Amino acid sequence: HYMHSDQWRYEGDFSEYAPIPPKTKWAKGHAADLEAAAVHQGWMPFFPQFKDNPIDLVRQAQDSGAKTDGEITQWAVKQLKDKKMQFSVEDPDAQENWPRIWIIWRGNAIQSSAKGHEFFLRHYLGTHDNIVAEEHAKGKTKTVKFTEPAPRGKMDLVVDLNFRMDSSALYSDIVLPAAFWYEKNDLNTTDLHSFVHPLSEAVPPVWESKTDWEIFKAFAKKTSELSSFAFPKPVKDLVTAPLKHDTPDELAQPKPLNWHAGECEPVPGKTMPHLQVVERDYANLYNKFISFGPKVREDGLSGHGIKIPVKEQYDELLKNPVGGTPDSRHMRCVEWDGKKYPSIEDTLDGANLLLQLAPESNGEVA
């Protein structure tokens, strides 16, 4: 948000704010350039990813002779190295790089949790604001392009899931009435202890409100229904992922060299973000939303460098019947395209599945 809300435009060189050692490598220049370097080196994610549509980039790679997913990523690496392909962070104010849809969920971003609220009003929404700061970044950035004039109103659509008419809802194009805490089934826990707090629905959601799960499920269903107009068949997408904490990725850069500056070679997953080709089957997006896929059976669950095999638990889940109504005491499966999957169609299905696979609640997994 620092880049897209154009807050970087109102900041100058580091030397304007504090004394800087003469031979320092990092504490110099402009914050926007350091953020661009962090994206180039795989230290942080940034969306949109590229100035070109990643689905179109895959097609370009295939037209250039790339046949396998590995060849597609190799093509992309060469394009990036030759500066024929550009990360969006390098030119955040180009229209191709604007974020267009903002879905606000479980927070009051506008006028509350968004740091630099007035900049969001001006550059995200294009509405009235009370900014008194002047732009200082012109001529101060080397990697990030400074475009004039600064764009106002980047967002085409703002959607808010909310049970309050707070400031985010007031500024949104669409407000989707969400269920209150006591109108949904949920699981609460934290990373500080292993206690699990199940919350049961006291009353159903009132009027037109829905639970978060049902709202996102409706998104998936409508996307599947409309997919035939744009994506009648599965398409391949080029996806970046940052280097991850508590994984071998942490050993990838003993020296933080920047390939974009010519200090080293671009190597996905080592000196730059991971690059992966992912197949998007939008026609089956809803089916996949309500199903717990089979990949976890082979790969297991992982986090913080620890892998937990759950093959036995997955096979046990497949023994449950297909169909029926959601029940906190029984589990279900769904079936589509001739295959059977553990169901996560309802929040009760999802909660039961989590309790079945979590080591905190299933001693066999622990």
What do the predicted segments below correspond to?
Residues 1-160, 165-366:
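Domain-level signature for respiratory redox metalloenzymes
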